[in-house]
């Protein structure tokens, strides 16, 4: 709405189990509307479960996403069978801004709302907020228990922004994309029955190594029996090398690094993941390798999305890698990959159970969601790196990040698929050599979402722009239109 009336409308695409009883899927696509105060896109509530809708807004040039959300909980004492609706979509708002480089205004509700038709109740606890294109929280309404506030308007919280400041950040985020790698996988409809997915739940122990100082500890690293242990990145090298030295120390497949990694896995009768500079002719790749208990290399992945530092010595790879093991389907990635949300989409679509990510130093950008919006006992706010946290949640898989510790911060962590209400976010303690957690894969049910439901609910008919080159005539036509679906062949 503007001073002259309606400017544009958006009809919700992401529908949850309650929504489908009342609504049909939207038919407006994700539009971006030019206004005197900036280019604005609209997203509704459960849309946040899917990374694609806010990405489509960014691809169409949005500067601001206006997001109508909720912060609902099930009522205290709700039986477990009915408690699967326990969630908090407003606790997802940071990913829209951080991954897409846009301003995000997330408005949520307050108080206890009752449905007069079926008698159900929503237990809203406030927390509306505004976020910068860098993924930083600018202002937030207090989180207030619903018993203390009636439903309705209980305050307006504001800050001053310059919408155009999003443009450079957004374009930087989008420039890291490689649409040729996503085509056609991210635009395909996945069948409800997927033979590639892990069918039988199985227990798995996950471990993320934590190293301090610059030295490598590869020679002394080994997993526990049938454990998946992920080491920090460039696992066989000191962490203070420049690009020229990293290139000089690059080695071919089957070289000293892979041999040492395989010996460590065999000695511990488990699975060991690390990364190294791999030389192949004149090219050097940042390669992640997975070794198994038999002392062999089970899979290799060449990083597809490089950080600025990696670009000074590495060539990007050209495909994601998922390895089927007795522990489940293990995907391989690097920390830099996680900044590009399409990578999460690829591994989700390939039915990854655990994503193994050798990482480096702790990131400056942490989870900034108000801890009061979480139902878990130890919220990740302020201590967990944001990108692995987001990847696990948006991809609905477990993520293990081996990393280094600097002062009070660490890149070593284990990230669960439903960190708001159900699964822990674990970071290695000071002085610990690793953090460990035993769980079940595929990620157990008990909440309102899982990987299968995530795939079933996708609107792949809207996703063609995600896999098109930005110079493609069809993409350009879709972007210029501003709203409405893509009609190109």
Where are these regions (language model features)?
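Active-site catalytic loop in hydrolytic enzyme cores
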Residues: 1-91, 95, 150-153, 162, ...
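Short, acidic, Ser/Thr-enriched surface-loop or helix-capping motifs
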Residues: 1-2, 131-133, 239, 292-293, ...
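Catalytic domains of carbohydrate-active enzymes, especially glycoside hydrolases
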Residues: 218-237
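Metal-dependent catalytic neighborhoods of phosphoester/phosphodiester hydrolases
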Residues: 235-253, 281-284
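C-terminal functional modules
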Residues: 460, 464-489
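CN hydrolase (nitrilase-like) catalytic-core segments centered on the catalytic cysteine
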Residues: 48-157, 250-273, 339-437
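Short beta-strand segments enriched in small/hydrophobic residues
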Residues: 194-213
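Short beta-strand-to-loop element that shapes/binds the nucleotide-sugar donor at the catalytic cleft/hinge
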Residues: 274-279
């Amino acid at each position: 709405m503007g001073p002259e009336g309606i400017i544009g409308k958006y009809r919700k695409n992401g529908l949850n189990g309650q929504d489908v009883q009342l609504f049909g899927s939207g038919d407006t696509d994700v539009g971006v509307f030019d206004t005197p105060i900036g280019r604005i896109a609209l997203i509704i509530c459960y849309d946040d479960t899917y990374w694609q809708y806010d990405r489509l807004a960014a691809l169409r040039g949005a500067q601001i996403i206006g997001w109508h959300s909720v912060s609902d909980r099930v009522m205290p004492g709700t039986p477990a069978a009915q408690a699967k609706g326990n969630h908090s979509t407003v606790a997802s708002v940071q990913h829209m801004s951080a991954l897409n480089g846009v301003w995000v205004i997330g408005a949520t509700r307050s108080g206890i709302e009752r449905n007069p038709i079926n008698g159900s109740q929503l237990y809203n606890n406030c927390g509306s907020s505004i976020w910068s294109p860098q993924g930083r929280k600018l202002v937030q309404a207090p989180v207030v228990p619903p018993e203390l506030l009636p439903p309705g308007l209980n305050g307006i919280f504001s800050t001053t922004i310059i919408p155009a400041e999003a443009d450079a950040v957004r374009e930087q985020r989008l420039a890291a994309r490689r649409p040729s790698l996503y085509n056609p996988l991210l635009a395909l409809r996945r069948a409800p029955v997927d033979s590639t997915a892990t069918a039988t739940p199985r227990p798995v122990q996950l471990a993320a190594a934590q190293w301090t100082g610059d030295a490598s500890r590869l020679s002394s690293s080994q997993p526990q029996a049938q454990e998946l242990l992920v080491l920090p990145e460039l696992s066989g090298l000191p962490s203070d090398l420049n690009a020229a030295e990293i290139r000089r120390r690059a080695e071919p497949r089957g070289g000293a690094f892979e041999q040492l990694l395989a010996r460590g896995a065999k000695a511990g009768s488990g699975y060991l993941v690390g990364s190294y500079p791999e030389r192949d002719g004149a090219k050097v790749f940042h390669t992640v390798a997975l070794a198994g208990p038999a002392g062999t290399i089970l899979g290799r992945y060449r990083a597809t999305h490089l950080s600025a530092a990696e670009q000074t010595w590495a060539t990007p790879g050209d495909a994601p890698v998922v390895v089927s093991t007795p522990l489940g389907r293990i995907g391989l990635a690097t920390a830099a990959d996680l900044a590009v949300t399409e990578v999460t989409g690829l591994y989700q679509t390939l039915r990854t159970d655990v994503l193994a990510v050798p990482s480096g130093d702790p990131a400056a950008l942490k989870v900034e969601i108000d801890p009061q919006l979480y139902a878990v006992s130890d919220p990740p706010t302020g201590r967990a790196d944001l990108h692995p946290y987001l990847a696990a949640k948006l991809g609905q898989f477990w993520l293990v990040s081996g990393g280094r510790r600097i002062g009070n911060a660490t890149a070593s962590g284990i990230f669960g698929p439903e960190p708001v209400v159900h699964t822990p976010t674990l970071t290695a303690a000071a002085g610990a050599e690793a953090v460990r957690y035993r769980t079940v894969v595929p990620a157990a049910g008990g909440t309102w979402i899982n990987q299968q439901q995530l795939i079933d609910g996708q609107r792949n008919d809207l996703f063609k722009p995600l896999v098109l080159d930005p110079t493609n005539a069809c993409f350009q036509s879709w972007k210029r239109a501003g709203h409405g679906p893509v009609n190109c062949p």
